[in-house]
C-alpha cells in the first residue's frame, strides 16, 4: 500500500532472542498519521516485541524503523508499577521528559484519570496502587504527552466497562488529532474503533486479519442537560447519534467510537454531561 508522508515504517524487521527461533521474520508495517492499526495474535506471537521496536524501546536484530515521531506515547505490556515515587511525581517526571508544560500536563492527566475512574490519591506511591489504578496511570502518561505516535500494548486489560468506553473515545480522538496509533488488544474492544486496520501476527509475519463481525458497534448512553430546548439540542446533535428528549434532559445512544466527538459538540452547546454509561446489549438502536 502507498505510504503517506510522516508514516511510521518498519522495513524487513527481524527479531531473534539468542538462539531461539525468530520472533519477527521480516515484518513490514506502515502506520500513517491519523491511522489506527490493531494487531492481534496468539500469546507468544511477538506482539509486544513488535510494539517495543515500534516505540523505540528495543532494536530489531535486522531491518530498520523510519519515520518515528519525536514524541511517543507508549504503554508497555508490563507497565512498571513497582516505583516508590508517588503517581503524581511520576506523571510530572514523564511530562518533563516529553518537554510538556507541567501545569497543563498535570491538568490533562488529572482529567483523564478522573474519566477512567481512578480511585484514591495520586500522592500514593506507584507500588501502592491496585493493578487497575496503575494501568490508568500508565494510560495517562501515554495519552497526555501530545504524542505523534501512540503505541499501546493491551490498553484495555484490567479496565471496567465504563473506563474501556472512555479509552475507546480517547484513542479515536488521538488519531483524529493527527497521531499514528498502533495497539494490541485481546479483549475485542478495539473492534469498535472507527476505520481501524486490523492485522494478525503469527509465525513472525503480519497479515490482514479476517473481517470483523458485521454486527452493530457497541453503544454508550449519554445523558445531558442543555440550556436550550431539548428538541433543539437533539436536532443539533442529530449528525452524531439518535437522540430523544426526556423532560428537561436529553438521552442519547452513541457508538463508542463517536462518543468523544459527541461530548465535545455537547459541551460546545453549553450542555452539562450528567452521565455516560454502556448501553445494554439489547438496547434499541
Annotate the PLM regions.
Residues 78, 83-99:
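Q-loop/switch helix immediately C-terminal to the Walker
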Residues 1-28, 33:
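A short, flexible loop at the N-terminus of ABC-type nucleotide-binding domains that lies
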Residues 55:
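Helix-to-loop junction immediately C-terminal to a conserved catalytic motif
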Residues 92, 104-121:
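Conserved ABC ATPase "signature" region
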Residues 150-154:
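Catalytic Walker B motif of ABC-type/P-loop ATPase nucleotide-binding domains
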Residues 40-42:
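The feature captures the beta-strand-to-loop junction immediately N-terminal to the Walker
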Residues 139:
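Hydrophobic anchor residue at the start of the ABC signature
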Amino acid at each position: 500500500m502507498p505510504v503517506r508522508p510522516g508514516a511510521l515504517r518498519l522495513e524487513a524487521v527481524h527479531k531473534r532472542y539468542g538462539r531461539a527461533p525468530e520472533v519477527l521474520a521480516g515484518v513490514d508495517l506502515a502506520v500513517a498519521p491519523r491511522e489506527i492499526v490493531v494487531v492481534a495474535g496468539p500469546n507468544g506471537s511477538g506482539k509486544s516485541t513488535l510494539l517495543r521496536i515500534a516505540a523505540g524501546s528495543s532494536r530489531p536484530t535486522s531491518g530498520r524503523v523510519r519515520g518515528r515521531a519525536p514524541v511517543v506515547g507508549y504503554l508497555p505490556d508490563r507497565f512498571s508499577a513497582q516505583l516508590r515515587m508517588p503517581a503524581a511525581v511520576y506523571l510530572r517526571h514523564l511530562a518533563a521528559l516529553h518537554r510538556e508544560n507541567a501545569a497543563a500536563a498535570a491538568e490533562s492527566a488529572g482529567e483523564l484519570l478522573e474519566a477512567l475512574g481512578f480511585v484514591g490519591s495520586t500522592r500514593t506511591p506507584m507500588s501502592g496502587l491496585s493493578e487497575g489504578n496503575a494501568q490508568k496511570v500508565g494510560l495517562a502518561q501515554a495519552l497526555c504527552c501530545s504524542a505523534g505516535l501512540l503505541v499501546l500494548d493491551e490498553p484495555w486489560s484490567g479496565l471496567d466497562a465504563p473506563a474501556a468506553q472512555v479509552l475507546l473515545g480517547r484513542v479515536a480522538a488521538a488519531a483524529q488529532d493527527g497521531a499514528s496509533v498502533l495497539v494490541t488488544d485481546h479483549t475485542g474492544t478495539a473492534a469498535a474503533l472507527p476505520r481501524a486496520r486490523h492485522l494478525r501476527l503469527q509465525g513472525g509475519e503480519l497479515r490482514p486479519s479476517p473481517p470483523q463481525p458485521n454486527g452493530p458497534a457497541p453503544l454508550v448512553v449519554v445523558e445531558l442537560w442543555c440550556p436550550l430546548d431539548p428538541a433543539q439540542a437533539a436536532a443539533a446533535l442529530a449528525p452524531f447519534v439518535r437522540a430523544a428528549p426526556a423532560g428537561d434532559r436529553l438521552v442519547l445512544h452513541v457508538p463508542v467510537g463517536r462518543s468523544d466527538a459527541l461530548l465535545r459538540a455537547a459541551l460546545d452547546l453549553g450542555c452539562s454531561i450528567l452521565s455516560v454509561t454502556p448501553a445494554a446489549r439489547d438496547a434499541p438502536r
